[in-house]
Curated annotation (Swiss-Prot):
GO terms for cellular component: cytosol. GO terms for molecular function: GTP binding; metal ion binding. Gene3D superfamilies: P-loop containing nucleotide triphosphate hydrolases. The lineage of its organism: Bacteria, Pseudomonadati, Campylobacterota, Epsilonproteobacteria, Campylobacterales. The keyword Magnesium applies. This is Probable GTP-binding protein EngB. It comes from Campylobacter jejuni (strain RM1221). GO terms for biological process: division septum assembly. GTP binds at residues 29-36, 56-60, 81-84, 151-154, 174-176. Belongs to the TRAFAC class TrmE-Era-EngA-EngB-Septin-like GTPase superfamily. EngB GTPase family. Disulfide bonds: none annotated. It comes from the Bacteria. Its cofactor is Mg(2+).
Length: 198
């Protein structure tokens, strides 16, 4: 279980050097899909990760040190909150630089053990999400895993939830509003970062 968390730093550039001795979990998704809210819910802190009301406004890479406990043993992992994509109103040139830097960051950062791909449960087949999933699969290492996490599932009825879970069997459905699915997600994060989830 996660017992505490704190903000470490924000990086403007993906190539800024921030070494890590801990396994890391990267949170990716479209702008306003609920990345910051999910991190806050997992860490049981209301304002740990700052969310923006303006889609695409958050352009920093935010690092959080998370202390977990399993079988009475404590260990550290890092959460990485990556900039949301899909709405950022920036110049084409700047967007290309971001994409190149992000590409290098994700491919070369060997400490990342789990990619959490957040998808709005009401919009499950957007091209931008399909492309992201295909992109991650191209360089995924044996010690890494991609986990689809469908957010805002409180907006769905039971039939819609069952249909979604049947289509994406290895996914997790969560709701920050009623805390649905958070315990299951926490277990996967801990097992994957410890190398137990094969």
């Amino acid at each position: 279980m996660i017992i505490s968390a704190k903000f470490i730093t924000s990086l403007v550039k993906f190539d800024e050097n921030l070494s890590s001795n801990f396994s890391e979990v990267a949170f990716l998704g479209r702008s306003n899909v609920g990345k910051s809210s999910l991190i806050n819910s997992l860490c049981k802190q209301k304002n740990l990760a700052k969310s923006s009301a303006t889609p695409g406004k958050t352009q920093l890479i935010n690092f959080f040190e998370v202390i977990c406990k399993r079988n009475e043993e404590k260990f550290n992992i890092n959460f990485i909150d990556l900039p949301g994509f899909g709405y950022a109103k920036v110049s084409k040139n700047l967007k290309e630089i971001w994409n190149q830097n992000l590409d290098e960051f994700l491919k070369l950062r060997t400490s990342i053990k789990l990619f959490i791909h957040l998808i709005d449960s009401r919009h499950t087949h957007l091209e931008i999400d399909v492309n992201l999933n295909d992109y991650l699969k191209r360089f995924l290492r044996p010690d890494q895993k991609i986990l689809k996490v469908f957010t805002k599932c409180d907006k769905l009825n039971q039939s819609e939830k069952a249909k979604l879970k049947n289509e994406f069997k290895d996914s997790i459905l969560v709701s920050n509003l009623n805390k649905f699915g958070l315990d299951s997600l926490e277990d996967i994060i801990i097992n994957q970062t410890l190398g137990l989830d094969k």
